Curated annotation (Swiss-Prot):
Subcellular location: Secreted
Biological processes, Gene Ontology terms: defense response to bacterium; innate immune response
UniProt propeptide residues: 18-45
Keyword match Secreted: yes
Family assignment from sequence similarity: Belongs to the attacin/sarcotoxin-2 family.
Annotated signal sequence range: 1-17
Cited function: Has antibacterial activity against both Gram-positive and Gram-negative bacteria.
Organism: Lonomia obliqua (Moth)
Domain of life assignment: Eukaryota
Designated name of the protein: Defense protein 3
Amino acid sequence: MFGKFVLLAVLLVGVNSRYVIIEDPVYYIEDHELPEQWTSSRVRRDAHGAVTLNTDGTSGAVVKVPIAGSDKNIVSAIGSVDLTDRLKVGAATAGLAIDNVNGHGASITDTHIPGFGDKLTAAGKINLIHNDNHDLTANAFATRNMPSIPLVPDFNTVGGGIDYMFKDKIGASASVAHTDLINRNDYSLGGKLNLFKTPDTSVDFNAGWKKFDTPVINSNWEPNFGFSLSKYF
């Protein structure tokens, strides 16, 4: 019984580790926000990066560099580092993303989490609405979690969500994820307000709320707030 409790505790910590997110401009809220948002809302052929600071003391940096493409599709190398509130590496991610001129995209990434193991994630998104006022995108992902912890098996997490932007100024998102091994569901809501924007620089305020439930443990909605700076080169 004690062994099962320890296993559950370890998995709860591992599954709760942050996925990294980058959009145009960046939108970064922790937990099960969707990694397919590595793909930009519209194709840009510039290298760009972003830095985010959160009110809980965590921070992160991401970079995306185009390496090949055509008039319709761009393939980019992507990477990121998440820092804990003690400025230690919480996660490191690397992978590839493809962006389509119509706002569709896909990515494959590997995330290494010290003390836990690796997560291999395939993700994609489809742009449903895009005009001068509204942008609506649906997305989904599947992750193979590969713990380096003895006696803990590999397991899967799948999820999906929607992202909405109004006049490229105010945004909202909602997502849900399910982890099969411990029957855990994660829920997240997010909001974004663009504070400053030029053709190559964007500053945003981000707000998020998250919760999870399992057959034995449930959480309340937990808030998190932060600011992000993204830059195109």
